[in-house]
Amino acid sequence: MLTYKEAGVNIEEGYRSVKLIKEYAKKTMSEYVLNGLGSFAGMIELPEGYKKPVLVSGTDGVGTKLDIACKKRKFDTVGIDCVAMCVNDILCHGAKPLFFLDYIACGKLEAEVSSDLVKGVAEGCIKSQCSLIGGETAEMPGMYKEGDYDIAGFAVGIVDKDKIINGKDIKSGDKLIGIASSGVHSNGYSLIRKVFKNLDEDFNGKAIWEELLTPTKIYVKPVLSLLEKFNIKGMAHVTGGGFYENLPRMLSKEGLSIVINKNSYEIPEIFKKLMELGVKEEEMYNTFNMGIGFVLCVEEDEVEEVLKELSKQGEKAFEIGYINAGGEGVCIK
């Protein structure tokens, strides 16, 4: 008689995976979590101190960056990417991350690999000050090839209703501050994999695949600190679509546009390398973060103090542009 295991689903390996994963998830639990992993659902109570609490949610994945991780069997950092992609998005509206859920899919489950993936997720949650309260691991033979994995995440945060950041107060003359990225982050990898045929080629003394698997930076701690001290009018997480698609998302009014000075900071070597290998500059700004992973909009008279505060927190940040009256979209000059 045919069994589930013979059909390609190993329940025992699933149990072993859960046992390994639980140890990492435990390290992320806050005082607000009401139950541990293993229940049908995760439960968390809302923190006190919010007058009109609003829940802010986001979901994302890591895209084809995972293809490099799968080829090089290096899975312990892409979980950080997954968390970063979600929490940086909800952060744009002023939300403090509360909890996170993950979803892992594969063709054949290997407990050590799923454990490495969740190890990264847990590390990302700790960096984001949120709890990993649940998830799902799906073994799907026939849907995925053996050795292939995918990961997605779901983040929920909280913000007071009157502190939601939605760009409504942004005006002409406001300045834009860019916080440095850690590298390519998690977007543009379908293009990258076409450009870099040999993942083992040297890049500044290490294999290019090592550079490409550098985890996406999580901006939660420095940005939440800024929100307590300054009037941050708008924020943008520079992800898929680069500058052209993401920066206008912080604007809620028509009649405003964004001007970026591309010479205001040094573009990292990895992006210069991509341009050397044939990717046009406009395509670069339309695909990648170009060294700036997160952008803040502030009043002109707060620029210097915001930059000082970010420097104190160990972040590289630059005044990269301004809000312009008239026009639309983004002008990079």
Curated annotation (Swiss-Prot):
Major enzyme class: ligase
Keywords per UniProt: ATP-binding, Cytoplasm, Ligase, Nucleotide-binding, Purine biosynthesis
Metabolic or biological pathway, per its Swiss-Prot or TrEMBL entry: Purine metabolism; IMP biosynthesis via de novo pathway; 5-amino-1-(5-phospho-D-ribosyl)imidazole from N(2)-formyl-N(1)-(5-phospho-D-ribosyl)glycinamide: step 2/2
GO cellular component: cytosol
Keyword DNA-binding annotated: no
SUPFAM superfamilies, per database record: PurM C-terminal domain-like (SSF56042), PurM N-terminal domain-like (SSF55326)
EC code: 6.3.3.1
Alphabetized GO MF terms: ATP binding; phosphoribosylamine-glycine ligase activity; phosphoribosylformylglycinamidine cyclo-ligase activity
GO terms (BP aspect): 'de novo' IMP biosynthetic process; adenine biosynthetic process
Keyword Ubl conjugation attributed: no
Catalytic activity annotation: 2-formamido-N(1)-(5-O-phospho-beta-D-ribosyl)acetamidine + ATP = 5-amino-1-(5-phospho-beta-D-ribosyl)imidazole + ADP + phosphate + H(+)
Compartments where found: Cytoplasm
CDD domains noted in UniProt: PurM (cd02196)
Top-level lineage group: Bacteria
NCBIfam families (UniProt xref): purM
PANTHER family to which the protein is assigned, alphabetical: TRIFUNCTIONAL PURINE BIOSYNTHETIC PROTEIN ADENOSINE-3, TRIFUNCTIONAL PURINE BIOSYNTHETIC PROTEIN ADENOSINE-3-RELATED
Entry-linked HAMAP family: AIRS (MF_00741)
Family: Belongs to the AIR synthase family.
Protein name as catalogued: Phosphoribosylformylglycinamidine cyclo-ligase
